[in-house]
Amino acid sequence: RVIRLVLQWAAMYGDLLQEDDVAMAFLEEFYVSVSDDARMMVAFKEQLAELEKTVKQISEDAKAPQKKHKVLLQQFNTGDERAQKRQPIRGSDEVLFKVYCIDHTDTTIRVPVAASVKEVISAVADKLGSGEGLIIVKMNSGGEKVVLKPNDVSVFTTLTINGRLFACPREQFDSLTPLPEQEGPTTGTVGTFELMSSKDLAYQMTTYDWELFNCVLELELIYHTFGRHNFKKTTANLDLFLRRFNEIQFWVVTEICLCSQLSKRVQLLKKCIKIAAHCKEYKNLNSFFGIVMGLSNVAESRLALTWEKLPSKFKKFYAEFESLMDPSRNHKAYRLTAAKLEPPLIPFMPLLIKDMTFTHEGNKTFIDNLVNFEKMRMIANTARTVRYYRSQPFNPDAAQANKNHQDVRSYVRQLNVIDNQRTLSQMSHRLEPRRP
């Protein structure tokens, strides 16, 4: 049983074990121990051969040239990729990232994705020539600032969509201001994507979301729930997938609020509802809910003149979609819908995260100094759900888009959005001032 358990563990987390010296040492020591015992117990010999093959394969893979760390570009932008298959980000991969100073000048550092804030400070200090009293601050587009703790990890991927990292002495904290680029676009892209079919847009969104979702490691759910700093591991793939949901939401609101023409806004609403419908057909609940939540954003839902001119058929579709977001009875409407769908399925990840967090915070990890296995089983069930959703491959050739599919593909991977709710609300009021 122990040998079988170790083999299953190695099969499931082989790539991750290669990054862990302790795990690799354990596997090799375990193999030696089983080899010794197999001399006296014939029953071990068959499993020994399988164990030897597994340990040898993992060791060879760890030394292979393609397993060496990648260097990722700032903001992890993947919009320029072509047919290249997306690979999960590993903690040992390095990132080239800009860290800004109080005067908005920047310095580019190169550190591992899983680097702690302490390591980031050290890298910045090397570039600036002085690190005395430096702090690392993350700032969103609205100017909200948070001083990061020295042991915080995954600092690059946990930024908001238009968030940036700043380095400054503690006494200059109050003087930090957002960069102009953090405000987002000043013109919409309606002229570009109104020429693209709704089905093509939904298909390319689904292809990209599937790539992101497929890269999320189950262990990242555990790290996120129990605290990244407790494991000193990255949750980069999960962070990027969660950020994609927010990106879709704000994309919908941004495009509507940047459209000054009433008739064009009505067409945009119709287009977004059509895209949401196709995403639902593709079982892409991530983008589906992102679009629906974008449409229900207060900056958009208050545009009475725009909604009044929307055909009743589309109002009915939207009402049906919105009902699936009903949070009553623990999101029963969504759970029933998801339960009826077969894999491959891209889930509404924020709800799965909420389930795991609720389980973690509502149950003790230890009871009378013993592991609370009931809690672990509940958390494992959520992780198994993710595995089930990915148990069948998403076939990217199943619905190949038309001639301009490369343009559509590039567009959905490089969305430029305004993520400042105050700014969006102000724009909304300029479009349709409050009625007396």
From Swiss-Prot:
Location relative to the cell: Cytoplasm; Membrane
Domain spans labelled Ras-GEF: 197-434
SUPFAM superfamilies documented for this protein: Ras GEF, Ubiquitin-like
One function term, GO molecular function aspect: cAMP binding
InterPro entries linked to this entry: Ras-like_GEF (IPR008937), Ras-like_Gua-exchang_fac_N (IPR000651), Ras_G-nucl-exch_fac_CS (IPR019804), Ras_GEF_dom_sf (IPR023578), RASGEF_cat_dom (IPR001895), RASGEF_cat_dom_sf (IPR036964), Ubiquitin-like_domsf (IPR029071)
Any Gene Ontology CC annotation: excitatory synapse
Main location: cytoplasm
Function summary: Guanine nucleotide exchange factor (GEF) for RAP1A, RAP1B and RAP2A small GTPases that is activated by binding cAMP. Seems not to activate RAB3A. Involved in cAMP-dependent, PKA-independent exocytosis through interaction with RIMS2.
Name of the protein in question: Rap guanine nucleotide exchange factor 4
Organism listed in the record: Rattus norvegicus
